[in-house]
Each structure stands twice: as C-alpha cells, then as structure tokens.
Amino acid sequence: MNSLKVARVVLRAVRPAPALRRGYADVAPDKLRLTLALPHQAMYKSQDVVQVNIPAESGEMGILAQHVPSIEQLKPGLVEIIEEAGGNKQFFLSGGFATVQPGSVLSINAVEGYPLEDFSAENVRNQISEAQKIASGSGSEQDKAEANIELEVLESLQAALK
C-alpha cells in the first residue's frame, strides 16, 4: 500500500474533533421575587419587587436581588416593600419567618399582617394604656404575660405609625 492510501485510511478512521461552542452563564435576576403569605390570603404572590425591608430578630434587614440565602425569624414590626414602579407599601406583621432562596426569591410567612394605613394612632394609644393596666395589675401571671406580649406588639406598631 502506498503512503497516500494509508493516509486516506487513517484520516477516515480518525473522528473529527467536536466543534466547541461558547456558553454563557444565565443572566442574574435584577429583581427580587416576593411572596408574602398569611394563613387566609397571599398579599404578594411571586411578584417582582426592588427591595424588601424586614424587622428580623437579628436586626433590621434590607433584602435586594442576589441576597445571600438565609432564614430569618421576624419580630413584630414594619415590612416595607419597594415596588418596581417606584412606589412602596408598608405592612405591619405580628411576627413570622422570612426565607431568602437562591435565584432572588423571598418568601415571608406571617400569622397576622395588615397594611399600615389600616391602623389609627389614637386606637393604638388607647390599647397600650389598657395593656399597661393589665400588665401592672393584680391579675394572674398568664394575664400579665399576655399583656406584656400585647404591649410589645402595640409599641412596635406605635413606632411604625410615627
């Protein structure tokens, strides 16, 4: 066999190298996808927002897109949601949990939550004085403990209304 025939046979036997194509990483989301759920309703259901400020037990937190994944216990306080259109909404939550998941997903679960504008500063002051009377009164230990918890929530609400 001459060398030309050998070269042809060898070339046919060799598999061509795969064509390499450039791959691109997925685009990182620039919005935060928020779900704010209560037992009886979803106030936000997978809606894109710019930022959410929460009252975590570890301190006040501002959460943006690409936040590190975490789980935070919420204390009673104001949750502020900055929406894409530039407006913001404020809700008072009695407590709960916030979970930041990979992919800029934030889930907030709370037992009670209401828009801040639903509250009257005068009514809150009246309820605080009633709870203080019970907490410092001669009632049972359980009544005093419940009044102290109520005071904590009402004082947080009063601070949010200012």
Name what the model sees in each region.
Residues 1-29:
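N-terminal mitochondrial targeting presequence
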Residues 19-24, 41, 157-158:
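Short N-terminal helix-initiation segments at or just after the protein's N-terminus
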Residues 25, 61-64, 141:
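Compositionally biased, intrinsically disordered low-complexity regions
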Residues 25-39:
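Acidic, gly/proline-rich low-complexity N-terminal segments at the extreme N terminus
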Residues 35-126, 130:
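Compact, glycine-rich, soluble single-domain proteins
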Residues 114-162:
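Acidic/glycine-rich phosphate/pyrophosphate-binding loops and surrounding catalytic core
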